[in-house]
């Protein structure tokens, strides 16, 4: 890019009018094309982002195209979407320039806004599928004297979670290009038929075409721009039915459907349950995962202590490695959909939440240093760290989080020394 040139000067267009051309093609040809190219970037264990880059097609572009294929659809057309038109549509989707990016550029905030929006679109499908399935298996089968997630899950979903995770794993495997290259089509079809025989599970992750459009409309109205960056309905329902046909345009989204999306379904409009899951389940998971690290020399769940007559609790998990110790706090928050709409007020709200979490850990570290509670031994301040662990990251600017955290601390204490500021910046992280 030449010096002085705006980012938008390098992009093709700032209109979504081209999407109306999707009405010319049959729904079947559009969604099967999405499925074909989705499968090409799927290995048996993950969505291969390196391959996606080489193929010049990103998962979020396929997801956007499949969503708009349903929105822009006519039942009386017969023309099929060909490969060249598919490629052109993907390029147009990729090169769309949102006016929110122009506003961010004017404010000198383009890098952080672009990274945030891009990450929210791309991060959910990245990574190995087995660790993710393991994590949510732990969540949905967790039982202690405070919560029985097995029973809760069956009561809300009608099936046990093991059936869902097995179904998701098999779907992912069967639709990956690696599997399709190794197993003959007939044999693979036999396997898929057996997997789809679990009608109760299939129903949980399937949405009818018109209902899909209704849900998208409820989320974003008729605003095509918000739909462009917004969370797609197929993250919850990757299977789309139309009359006697069933489509899965992005097969890899079956993993998202039975993990983070399923947790959101279980806790929908039930903040009490989500708080309990955060307190009992996710804290326990964090403790169990950290305790299995071979480098950990000491670990403790949260410790109750008092300051004067007031009862306090430490961070969720405290773990040491030699002479270093880390305070971990788990946060089961979910990024607001408004963040994807470039809503500065909502972005600032999430920054404030993260900043409060940072200061909460800072106070715990200070309380330890002041002698309000003890660990297995004495640790020097420079060897004490804080980690805010978020289940779903809003990917807001960490720089703004730290600035806000220092601002909050200054309101509490009147002044914040450069030493304290530097300590917070260098020793407390959000991951």
Model-found features: residue ranges?
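Long, acidic, intrinsically disordered low-complexity segments
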Residues: 2-18, 213-228, 308-326, 331-336
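Catalytic core segments in nucleotide and nucleic-acid processing enzymes
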Residues: 261-431
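Interfaces and regulatory segments of ATP-dependent nucleotide/adenylate/phosphodiester-chemistry enzymes
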Residues: 34, 39-40, 46, 60-63, ...
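Non-catalytic C-terminal interaction segments of nucleic acid-processing enzymes
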Residues: 2-57, 380-382, 389-431
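Residue-level signal for secondary-structure boundary elements
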Residues: 27-30, 101, 373
